A protein has these predicted regions:
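Bacterial N-terminal signal peptides
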Residues: 1-7
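N-terminal signal peptide c-region/cleavage motif recognized by signal peptidases
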Residues: 9-11
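N-terminal, motif-rich segments that launch catalysis or mediate targeting to/interaction with membranes
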Residues: 13-152, 159-288
Length: 288
């Protein structure tokens, strides 16, 4: 069973574009007015042309675009940043420190955006937060910190970005479900279950906002990125992986209507938590 209140109904890109946009729109709703102006000012300096416009919802997809922009060329950005989007906590022997490469420190005078490739989403959120709240961080690096945070806070809430069953976070598990195209388990959690919420990120975010209570906000704002990763891991262990049926003779997992229903409930919960927590991060780091 999911730990949610009764108000809640039952190529790696965590959440896909729509999911990240939903998280950003929820977060924007909870921003202090002065903080929202500072966010807008930082994002307005983005000259990368990797996303359309400079809204929070658009920029929440920037980190994926940045990672993939040179994927078919020299792969510099791809190889440097791809592991920053997840933390592969092993399902059978969970160890966050091991999944985070023993938490390597940034080399002296190295900005977080140029940090080691072997690092995890938990550490990168902490590093980019430290830069964002430091007014002495260079303007360009501060904008990069914001762009990464808009995305990575969403990533750590996708259960299959915080767990691994020796299957690349579900990418090697073939699945199908009634009325849905066959695919892999990771893609279902990234994209397909989000699509079942509705095609329009704006309307989905408004619907989820209507279900978030004051007690939800108070509870969800507690904890650290490491806590969020562990929370996502246990959700993956209970639902994403834990509720899978046995594979059929061809190695495919045929998901039941009940599995899809529980997955949708989990996705709604995680998108909402991510939005509330992203707002808390930005309000804390940009309030000064």
């Amino acid at each position: 069973m999911l730990c949610a209140s009764a108000a809640w109904p039952p190529l790696v890109r965590a959440w896909g574009d729509e999911g990240h946009q939903i998280v950003a729109l929820i977060a924007q709703h909870y921003l202090d007015a002065r903080v929202e102006l500072r966010v807008q000012a930082l994002l307005a300096s983005d000259r990368s042309a990797l996303v359309s416009g400079s809204s929070m919802a658009s920029e929440a997809t920037w980190a994926d675009r940045y990672r993939d922009a040179d994927r078919d060329a020299d792969r510099r950005h791809y190889e440097q940043t791809r592991q920053w989007h997840y933390v592969d906590i092993e399902l059978s022997s969970p160890n966050l420190a091991r999944a985070c490469f023993a938490h390597p420190a940034l080399p002296p005078a190295t900005p977080a955006s140029a940090g080691p490739a072997e690092d995890c989403v938990v550490d990168k959120i902490d590093q980019f937060e430290a830069e964002l709240r430091n007014a002495r961080t260079s303007p360009d690096e501060r904008r990069l910190a914001l762009q990464f945070l808009l995305h990575l806070v969403g990533d750590v809430h996708q259960p299959l970005h915080a767990s691994d069953d020796r299957d690349h976070g579900g990418n090697r598990k073939r699945v199908s479900a009634p009325g849905m195209h066959a695919g892999n388990l990771h893609h279902y959690w990234d994209t397909e279950f989000v699509r079942l919420l509705g095609e329009d990120a704006q309307s989905v975010s408004q619907r989820l906002l209507g279900r978030i209570s004051a007690s939800d906000i108070e509870a969800w704002q507690r904890g650290s990125p490491a806590d969020w990763a562990r929370e996502s891991f246990w959700l993956a262990k209970a639902v994403s992986y834990g509720a899978l049926p046995p594979a059929d003779g061809g190695g495919r997992y045929r998901l039941s209507v009940g599995y899809v229903r529980d997955a949708i409930s989990a996705v709604q919960l995680q998108l909402s938590r991510a939005g509330v927590r992203l707002a808390a991060v930005l309000n804390r780091d940009l309030r000064q």
